[in-house]
Amino acid sequence: MSRRFARAALALAALSTPGRASADAPEGSMRWVQTGGVPFPAGVKSVLITRDDQPLAREPRGDAARRGSALGGVALPVYGVRPGGVGCPGRWLLVGPQAWLCQNQAQLSAGEPLAPGGWPPRPPDGLPFRYYFVGKGGTQAYARVEFADDAAPERELEPGFALAIVEERTKGGQSYGRSRRGLWVPMRDLLPARATSFRGEAVEGDKLDVAFTYLDKTPVYPRPEPSARPTAAPLKRLRSLRVLEETGRGGGVYYRVGEGEWVRAADVRRPLKAPPPADALPGEKWVDVELATQTLVAYEGPRPVYATLVSTGRGAQGTDTATPRGVHRVWVKLVSSTMDNLEDEDAASHYAIEDVPYVQFFAKAVGFHGTFWHDGFGRVRSHGCVNLSPLDAQWLFDFTGPRLPAGWTGVLPTEFEPGVLVRVR
C-alpha cells in the first residue's frame, strides 16, 4: 500500500505543563508571565501562524514529540509561555491543550484569536475544500501565477490527478487556481469533483433498526413470501430504511420498511448491534466497522448513535489491501492528507489525490477518510482504508477523539484525550 503522509506523526511524549497567569492581569486578559518572572508583552492576544501545517509540540522542548499542526494564516490563542532554549531562541508559547510553539515560528498579535469552530469549514457537501480532477489532456502546474503559461512548469499533472483549489486569480483573461500545496494550475484543464449527498442516519434509542440500499434497484415486495412478485417501484441505491418488522429465517429473511412494503435482507445492508470492546471504559465513544455488511456504527457505551454505509478493503485478511480486523485506536487525525496508489479500484484513472478529507488513521496507514471520487458505499472497494461519504467523514471526525482545536490541521492523542476505539470485525 503506497501512501504519502501530509504530516509526520511522532511517538507520544510526556505531558506538558501550562504557563502561569500574571497576578495583576485583568480577568479574561491574555497577559502571562514566564516561570522565571520575565513578563510577556502586554496586549498580545494571539499568535499568527506563518506557515501551513506548522508543527506543534507536546512540550516546550526542541526535541518534543508532535502534538498536532496548525493552519497557516490563522491566529491561535496564547495561554502561557516558557523560556526558550536549544531549538528555540525565543519564548515557547502555549497555543492549545498541551500544544507548544516556538515564538520565532510565528508572529505575536494584538488581534483576537480564531473563534471556536472557525476552521476547518463545514460546507453543506462535507468537503473542506473545492476539489478538481485534471482533465484527459493533463496540465502543468507553476510555482507562481506570474509564471503560468509563460515559463517552465514546476510539475506535470497527468489525467486523473485530483487537487484542492483554495484561491483563483486571473492573468491575461485566463483563470488560474492555487492548490493547497501552493501550485498554480490553469482552471481550463480542471473538472470539478461532485460529492455524493449520501449520509448515514442518527439512531434513536437503543434499537439499531436502520438498513441501507446498495443495489442499483432494490426490489420491494407486497408480502414476505418467495412467491410474491416485486412491485413496480424498486428502491434506488443509497437510501436509508427503517426496519419496522423482521420475519423469516436463513436465506428467506425479510424486513418490513413501510405499509405493505418488504425487502429481502439479502438485498440491503443492515448493521448488527454489538457490545463494546473489552478495552472500552463505561460510556466511552467507540466505532464499529462490520466487514460483512459494509457498515459503520458509532457508539457511546452500549448505545448506537449513528449508522452508515462504508467501503472497506477488498483484500483477504493479512494482505496489504485488507482492512485489518481487531481493536485499534485512532493515532492521528488530519483535516486532509495526500494519497497515491488510490484507495479505489479505479486507481488507473485516479492515481493520486491531494488533500483527501477528514483522515483518521487507526492501524498504521489504514484509517477512515472522506471519498468524493466514488459513491459505491456498501460494497468492498478500497485498498484498505474505510471509505465514507464526505458528510459521514465530517460527522465522524467531529464525533471521535482527540478533538481538533480551531485552526489546527492535525492532532495526535494525549493521555487525557486518547484516540477513539475502533473495532473491525
Question: Which sequence ranges carry the predicted segments?
Answer:
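Boundary regions of SH3-family modules and the immediately adjacent low-complexity/disordered segments
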Residues: 24-44, 91-139, 178-213, 256-285
